[in-house]
């Protein structure tokens, strides 16, 4: 993927984002992407917001963009969430069947890998875990939907995929004008809980999620009666970084929930009942 270059890994990383943002803006300006056209500034802003997963919009994603345009936004969110170099490097490696030593040096710097031999293994795991969680989230979102609020099964599927990816990448984009406060969705608490969980998994980051998955996989294999008796694996524990992150995330979430619940109980939450 990478030949000898004057750019260091940090410059290459930033440059790749500028490139995908410009490409995304160009794609969003295609006639098929919008119903009534879009200015370059609005397209550039939307593309930047999607790639940098900020969730800020200057036009309504639901009514301004066609399904094709929304797919472009979804692609930009996914690439921005994973990092364009993760995509480009891994799939180039996959199709070419190998990598140069210099490529691995660049990627190990970008991915903070301690061993060169683990660079592509790490990239593969990042993509695998990301797509797996997004797939599970999309299925759960689909099962939580009320058919009466979406016109067809294909719309339900697209809605599920879009919001699963948007949630995992912490992007904040929605195909609903008022996001999930939209009438017909604001009281769908199962949908909200699924999106919350997906937000958290995406926000924790790959190293934490990978460590948690490895830990629970090891614990499950220890008690699995169908596991091969010769099963042997390095004992997995939650490392200090994972523990600190999990405790901090849980604590802040619980404290914020309690404060928001009592402060807004008779205001924005007044239309809900109980903990809903």
Regions found by a protein language model. Give the residues of each.
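Membrane-proximal intracellular helices of multi-pass ion channels
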Residues: 1-276
């Amino acid at each position: 993927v990478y030949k000898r270059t004057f750019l260091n890994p940090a410059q290459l990383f930033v440059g790749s984002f500028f490139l995908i943002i410009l490409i995304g803006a160009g794609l969003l300006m295609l006639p098929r992407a919008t119903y009534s056209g879009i200015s370059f500034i609005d397209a550039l802003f939307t593309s930047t917001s999607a790639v940098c997963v900020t969730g800020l919009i200057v036009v309504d994603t639901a009514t301004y963009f066609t399904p094709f345009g929304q797919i472009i936004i979804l692609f930009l969110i996914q690439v921005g969430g994973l990092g364009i170099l993760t995509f480009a490097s891994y799939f180039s490696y996959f199709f070419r069947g190998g990598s140069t030593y210099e490529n691995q040096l660049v990627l190990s710097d970008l991915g903070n890998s301690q061993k060169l031999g683990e660079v592509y293994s790490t990239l593969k795991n990042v993509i695998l875990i990301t797509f797996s969680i997004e797939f599970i989230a999309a299925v759960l979102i689909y099962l939580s939907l009320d058919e009466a609020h979406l016109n067809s099964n294909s719309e339900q599927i697209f809605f599920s995929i879009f919001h699963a990816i948007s949630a995992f990448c912490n992007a904040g984009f929605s195909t609903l004008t008022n996001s999930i406060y939209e009438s017909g969705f604001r009281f769908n608490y199962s949908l909200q809980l699924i999106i919350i969980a997906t937000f958290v998994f995406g926000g924790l980051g790959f190293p934490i999620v990978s460590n948690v998955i490895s830990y629970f996989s090891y614990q499950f294999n220890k008690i699995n009666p169908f596991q091969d008796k010769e099963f042997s694996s390095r004992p997995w524990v939650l490392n200090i970084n994972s523990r600190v992150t999990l405790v901090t995330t849980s604590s802040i979430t619980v404290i914020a929930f309690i404060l928001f619940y009592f402060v807004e109980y008779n205001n924005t939450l007044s239309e809900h009942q109980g903990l809903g």
